[in-house]
């Protein structure tokens, strides 16, 4: 009897040690097909098509916390991509951090979602293709090696500030500053996210200074209905062209409604013509994505979507269409 009790106690020790550690993740994959046509001077100059089995953003993570007393907790998370196609490698390549949480809010350091990325509910699509999600407006979203503070919620209002150091931004990029707020009242919500960088290297021949971005999202979200609209504005100075002024404004909207196990969804995004040295650019675009999810259970869902994107107008434009089906399981 005594030996059995000792054996049972020893067997329970690893379980007790892991009690505050959570394993979680999502496996999602599917088949996507696309066709892109480029027009120049009214003539078709290129046509590209493709169909393939793709990973839709699978991930696996570990997270936990320790009670330090007096309402203070240590928190941590290690999350990484987990492509079923075997194309991902490394640890902590998604949101991964260590920090403290208490009545003062939450303070974390590591690879963290930018404040702007946390306003990304406007793009809820699971896709690999840029044509099956409103990815144009989502391009500035990122995960940054940074320090971030999130305040506690007061009467539905909370705020965040974030700082990414110069040495973590890359050789030709400066430090960046980020801030935002969230307001919730019943199902209604308002979100703001913004960022500023002194200088950024876009590519070898394009450098910009005084880059700033602002996004405002508002909508309604409950168990059945989700409706949101967003407006985003970017502004910068182009170094190679005598610090000319560059800016673009984009808008997007998403509507979804749950009918039993089925959730149909539609998104629309529009990019207005950008300003480049006081001249209009042909970088305007329109994008539409429609689709639906069917829930087999709380964890497993089937996905289907179709998308259309047009950049430019008239004789010079780029038009793409795409479709996809997939399966998603959460654990």
Curated annotation (Swiss-Prot):
GO terms for cellular component: cell outer membrane; pore complex. Belongs to the Gram-negative porin family. GO terms for molecular function: porin activity. InterPro entries: Gram-neg_bact_OMP, Gram_neg_porin_domain, Porin_dom_sf, Porin_Gram-ve, Porin_Gram-ve_CS, Porin_Neis. One of its GO terms (biological process) is monoatomic ion transmembrane transport. It comes from Neisseria meningitidis serogroup B. It is found in: Cell outer membrane. It is a multi-pass membrane protein. The gene is porB. The keyword Ribonucleoprotein does not apply. Homotrimer. Residues 1-19 form the signal peptide. This is Major outer membrane protein P.IB. Serves as a slightly cation selective porin. Keywords: Cell outer membrane, Ion transport, Membrane, Porin, Signal, Transmembrane, Transmembrane beta strand, Transport.
């Amino acid at each position: 009897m005594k030996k059995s009790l000792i054996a049972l106690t020893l067997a329970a020790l690893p379980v007790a040690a892991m009690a505050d550690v959570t394993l979680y993740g999502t496996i999602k994959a599917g088949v996507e097909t696309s066709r892109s046509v480029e027009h120049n001077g009214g003539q078709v100059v290129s046509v590209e098509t493709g169909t393939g089995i793709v990973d839709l953003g699978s991930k696996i993570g570990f997270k936990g916390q320790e009670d330090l007393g007096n309402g203070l907790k240590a928190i941590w998370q290690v999350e990484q991509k987990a492509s079923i196609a075997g194309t991902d490698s490394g640890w902590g390549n998604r949101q991964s951090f260590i920090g403290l949480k208490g009545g003062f809010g939450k303070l974390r350091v590591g690879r963290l979602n930018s404040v702007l990325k946390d306003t990304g509910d406007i793009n809820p699509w699971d896709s690999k293709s840029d044509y099956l999600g409103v990815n144009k407006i989502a391009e500035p979203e990122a995960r940054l090696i940074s320090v971030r503070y999130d305040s506690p919620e007061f009467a539905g209002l909370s705020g965040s500030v974030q700082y990414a150091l110069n040495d973590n931004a890359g050789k030709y990029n400066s430090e960046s500053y980020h801030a935002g707020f969230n307001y919730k009242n019943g199902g209604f919500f308002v979100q703001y996210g913004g960022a500023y960088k002194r200088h950024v290297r876009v590519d070898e021949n394009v450098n910009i200074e005084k880059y700033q971005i602002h996004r405002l999202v508002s909508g309604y979200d409950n168990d059945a209905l989700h409706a949101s609209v967003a407006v985003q504005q970017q502004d910068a100075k182009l170094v190679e062209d005598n610090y000319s002024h560059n800016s673009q404004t984009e808008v997007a909207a998403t509507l979804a409604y749950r009918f039993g196990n089925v959730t149909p969804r539609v998104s629309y995004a529009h990019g207005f013509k950008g300003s480049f040295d006081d001249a209009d650019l042909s970088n305007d675009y329109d994008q539409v994505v429609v689709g639906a999810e069917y829930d087999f259970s709380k964890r497993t869902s089937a996905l289907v979507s179709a998308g259309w994107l047009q950049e430019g107008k008239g004789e010079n434009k780029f038009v793409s269409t795409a479709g996809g089906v997939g399966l998603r399981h959460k654990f």
